[in-house]
Amino acid sequence: NKSANIFLVHESVYDHTYNVLLTRARPLGITLKRFDSYNPEFTNSIFGMLIQLPGQNGDLFNPSFLISKAHKKDISVCASIDPLAQVLIKPIAHFGVDIAIGSMQRFGVPVGFGGPHAAFFACNERFRRLIPGRIVGETISKDGEKSLRLALQTREQHIRREKATSNICTAQSLLAIISSFYAVYHGCEGLNNIARNLVILRSYLEQGLYKLGFIINKDVRFDSIDVYSSKSVEVHKSAIKNGFNLRILPLGSDINNSTGFGISLDELSNIDEIHKILDFIADAINKNIDFEEIPKDNLFNLNGIPLREKKFLQQNVFENYRSETDLMRYIFSLAEKDFSLVDGMIPLG
């Protein structure tokens, strides 16, 4: 339907992502509409939809019905995903999405006040010639060995300038390499441990907040918690005093008129950090907390969303480098194969 001009954006999508979409959509005559239902009404004027897993408040939902319903109306579905969450949940492609996007910041790259971070982009066969950038594929060399070459002609020389896609994205090569070696170092087992630990710590934090009398909704969550409370102003002030930066809820408000707070954990979070958080929250509401009373059994809980069944990263390279010395030697061996301006001139084109 070429007359369709509405693109749906789920409420789970980060606000800053939505603002970027607005900037791109306006000059193209595309109307963005946010929706918060898991069973929206799809009209003929809608051509696409963006969802996010986990959502901006950490919630994980099963998008199967939503995606299936969209496809029946010939609506393309794009998913913004967290690679660390993908370690645990069913691969996003198996849900039937058409396009998957995301940031690799999770894999060994500090937050850095917003970036830069390497992005990733994947799509089904239908959109392969619309992928931005230059696509490298595997082939066989004249000597019968595996080799890499540019696989799709997305360059300006072959396509009318306004439809060329090779020059509409920026290569964050160094950051992509850092994230790749993070996966090489940890492998399937290590990444699984990191992701599972995040879920367990988040669940433990939830149990501690319950003990302090807070009410938290029962959504399935990965690494984040949203709490609404009449004591949120006091909690925010106590957090700042103790060196923590909590999310101010609702979005767009400031500390003095906030009605809630959000907490997000990451790969560096540990039990000591959780205890510090619970301590300053307890102090803010004039209560005491006994960590021995917090339940510690069955903390890994992602009920309601299909989990990954098969192992991933099974190539030898993700199994062989578990010490820093081995990894350093491997990186250097690859660097020695590189040809750069250090070695000679590189012709353009």
Summary of predicted features, one role per range:
Residues 1-147, 209, 213, 226-227, ...:
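Conserved PLP-enzyme active-site core in the AAT-like
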Residues 2-3, 46, 99-102, 154-161, ...:
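Short acidic (Asp/Glu) and glycine-rich catalytic loops that position anionic groups and cofactors
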Residues 8, 260-266, 312-314:
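Short glycine-rich or small-residue beta-strand-to-loop segments that form or flank ligand, phosphate
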Residues 8, 16, 20, 58-61, ...:
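Generic recognition of stable, solvent-exposed alpha-helical segments in well-folded globular domains
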Residues 11, 38-41, 87, 135-144, ...:
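A glycine-rich phosphate-binding loop feature that marks nucleotide/adenosyl-phosphate handling sites
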Residues 64, 68, 271-347:
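Flexible inter-domain linker/hinge segments
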Residues 107-208, 212, 216-219:
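Active-site C-terminal subdomain of aminotransferase-like
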Residues 189-280, 289, 328, 332-336, ...:
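Conserved C-terminal alpha-helix-loop-beta "cap" of PLP-dependent enzymes
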